[in-house]
């Protein structure tokens, strides 16, 4: 479920790969993904959990993966 905090059109393949690494390889929580993205790309959302979830959903979908299945969740 998305919360409209991220416009999927703004997520590049490079950003999606970085988000995937944080979530899937480094086991970041949605809050940690949100904070890392805010720090790296500049966002006022900070560690907002809904923002982190939306980033993961947008990234997974761009990569052709299901954001609610392994390895995302």
What are these regions (language model features)?
Residues 1-16, 69-73:
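Basic, amphipathic alpha-helix used for nucleic-acid engagement in HTH/winged-helix/SANT-Myb modules
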Residues 6, 11, 28, 45-46, ...:
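Short coil/turn linker and secondary-structure boundary residues
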Residues 22, 26, 40-44, 62-67:
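Short, flexible helical or helix-coil boundary motifs
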Residues 33-36:
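Short alpha-helical "recognition helix" segments of helix-turn-helix
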Residues 38-59:
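Short, basic interhelical loop/turn and adjoining N-cap
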Residues 55-73:
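Short Lys/Arg-enriched helix C-cap and helix-to-coil transition segments
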């Amino acid at each position: 479920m998305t919360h409209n905090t991220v416009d999927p059109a703004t997520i590049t393949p490079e950003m999606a790969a970085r988000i995937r690494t944080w979530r899937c390889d480094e086991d970041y929580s949605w809050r940690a993904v949100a904070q890392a993205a805010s720090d790296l790309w500049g966002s006022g959302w900070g560690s907002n959990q809904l923002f982190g979830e939306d980033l993961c959903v947008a990234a997974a979908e761009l990569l052709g993966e299901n954001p609610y299945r392994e390895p995302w969740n």
